[in-house]
Regions:
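Metal/cofactor-centered catalytic core regions of large enzymes
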Residues: 1-567
């Protein structure tokens, strides 16, 4: 007899996410992903000055704010054919790399680690043994027995107080939890240390962006960061050196803690290298422009199909016609009018709610396709496209994780296993490791260019009072490819659409009734305890929807069986 699990709400970003699963014989047989809140931000920016849009649309999300801001500015600059000063590109790139580093660290430790780590088990750990386990694996200075003892005592104090605080309401003791006590203790210690590390990443964003979240320094035409090495109120030498100090600290944590912990989780949960396979078509945008027209990048983009790297088709610029012409959104299963696929520049956002229907409309999220196909975006897509493009540093970082995995298990991690729940987490770690090189590279490039006497960070845009101009701003955000599509008519915005990573991945069935990436990734997942569907949460978290969710389980007649809180 089948059961139905409803997880509602799931995510705190891009509105609210509801997941429904049918379970037969202990395995997910069908799934539905539903966005349960209408965003409507596209309607808000219509009839406004295109220079104002970035400040408004970064409020689409309270976590990945910076990405929406930069994508919107790029859309306006694309429409107006603006050549951005290279210093502005360097500053934007540093902000984006630091922001994404922050996002990836928060995802792994604060948002998804507790799907794999049993806090209560850490109470049984031997701190000396925990420290010894990391000998020859990590040189992190806080991996000592003394540090682990301090953390264990903190956990004991929390338990004794009866108030677990941030560790309350977890699935402690769940049969799917497999880490030994010492590894659980290590993970809890790193969880707490990550809180300080992510703060350092945010400091880089705030020092350049003015604040975080919701940076204030962008402008259509560059950035509002005047450079004067001798002036207190500008981007001067002292501030640049201060920023560099945080960049250096980030790299140590990412390499010696985050990367190692990723390999450890994979080593103790090898079955999750076989589960969670989603859409096998992957799409990624090139990122970190090194010229003023977004035509040359540090990271390549691309598209590949059927999980086959040999099908890779490079995407070399943000003006690539192959990329622009392939994107459509349909609303056959979403609560909007105009169900047929639409190109974003002609897209509409007219709500038409008429209730939930498994076979009809069930989401406020549209269904994007790339040349008619469902695709997955995100760090896994990013990693696979860079591997297919032959990017050496990507292969190096992946090989380092594979080597750690092999050292811990004696087994080889195969490429086919990356199309999985843990494959997404590995892809995110590889991305974060590479971002540390980007931070150093772009900081040094900025310093060198300033040393040549180039202090330019902004060019004044010319917005014609008549005529129509279209632009698109692509960006490889922490959760995948983001694009903002702007139409400027007679000096104001006449149409605006944002196709965000969560749209690509959490979209409902598309115009051809093909399931979305979230939905596909859940099918075939075994569920040990329907009252505690931890396995569903693990896979959804692997896409990084930043969630704290209330789980409701119902029986075949629709009656609620249990209500629990999931971290």
């Amino acid at each position: 007899m089948s059961q139905r699990i409803t997880i509602d709400p799931v995510t705190r970003i891009e509105g609210h996410l509801r997941i429904d699963c049918e379970i037969e014989n202990g395995v997910v047989s069908k799934a539905w992903a539903s966005g349960t809140m209408w965003r409507g931000m596209e309607e808000i920016v219509k009839n406004r000055d295109p220079r104002d849009a970035w400040m408004i649309v970064q409020r689409i999300c309270g976590v990945c704010t910076t990405t929406h801001a930069i994508s919107s500015v790029r859309a306006a600059e694309s429409a107006l054919n603006i050549d951005v000063p290279v210093n502005a590109q360097y500053i934007r790139n540093i902000i984006l790399a630091a922001h994404t580093t922050h996002d990836h660290i928060v995802h792994f430790y604060q948002l998804s680690a507790l799907d794999w780590v049993d806090i209560t088990s850490a109470l049984k750990a031997d701190p000396e043994k925990a420290s010894a386990m990391l000998d020859g694996v990590s040189s992190w200075h806080l991996n000592s027995a003394q540090e682990f003892t301090k953390v264990q005592n903190k956990i004991k104090d929390l338990v004794a107080s009866g108030q677990l605080g941030i560790f309350a309401n977890g699935y402690w003791g769940h049969p799917a939890m497999q880490l030994p006590p010492e590894v659980n203790l290590i993970a809890v210690a790193h969880y707490l240390q990550a809180l300080e590390c992510q703060r350092d990443a945010n400091r880089v964003v705030a020092l350049l962006g003015g604040k975080s979240p919701h940076i204030q320094n962008l402008a259509v035409g560059g950035v509002a960061n005047p450079i004067n090495l001798d002036s207190i109120g500008t981007l001067n030498l002292e501030r640049l050196m201060y920023i560099k100090s945080f960049i250096d600290k980030l790299s140590d944590f990412v390499e010696q803690v985050y990367k190692v912990d990723t390999a450890v989780i994979a080593a103790y949960y090898p079955e999750w290298l076989e589960r969670g396979k989603g859409a096998v078509n992957y799409l990624s945008a090139p990122e970190f422009p090194t010229d003023g027209k977004n035509g040359s990048f540090l990271f390549p983009g691309g598209y590949l199909t059927n999980a086959d790297l040999s099908t890779y088709r490079p995407i070399t610029s943000h003006s690539d016609e192959f990329l622009i012409k392939g994107i459509q959104e349909s609303a056959k299963h979403a609560w909007y009018k105009d169900e047929a696929p639409q190109a974003p520049w002609e897209g509409t956002t007219i709500p038409a709610y008429d209730g939930w229907s498994d076979d009809g409309k069930y989401s406020w999220v549209k269904s994007p396709t790339f040349y008619g196909k469902t695709v997955e975006v995100g760090p896994l897509a990013n990693m696979l496209c860079k591997l297919a493009a032959g990017r050496e540093s990507t292969q190096t970082k992946l090989n380092e994780i594979i080597a750690l995995y092999q050292k811990l298990t004696g087994k080889t991690l195969e490429m086919a296993q990356l199309h999985s729940t843990l494959g997404r987490i590995i892809g995110r770690t590889v991305h974060c490791c590479e971002l540390q090189n980007v931070l150093q590279d772009q900081y040094n490039a900025l310093i060198v260019n300033i040393g040549k006497g180039d202090y330019t960070t902004f060019v004044k845009p010319n917005i014609p009072a008549t005529g129509e101009f279209k632009g698109v701003g692509f960006l490889e955000a922490p959760r995948g490819m983001l694009s903002h599509w702007m139409v400027i008519k007679d000096g104001i915005i006449s149409n605006y659409q944002a196709v965000v990573p969560s749209t690509w991945n959490s979209g409902p069935r598309n115009f051809n009734d093909d399931v979305g990436p979230y939905e596909q990734s859940l099918v075939g997942t075994p569920i040990a305890d329907p009252a505690k569907p931890l396995e569903v949460v693990r896979t959804i978290h692997s896409f990084d929807p930043c969630m704290a969710c209330a789980v409701h389980v119902v029986d075949a007649d629709g009656n609620e069986v249990v209500s629990v809180k999931v971290l």
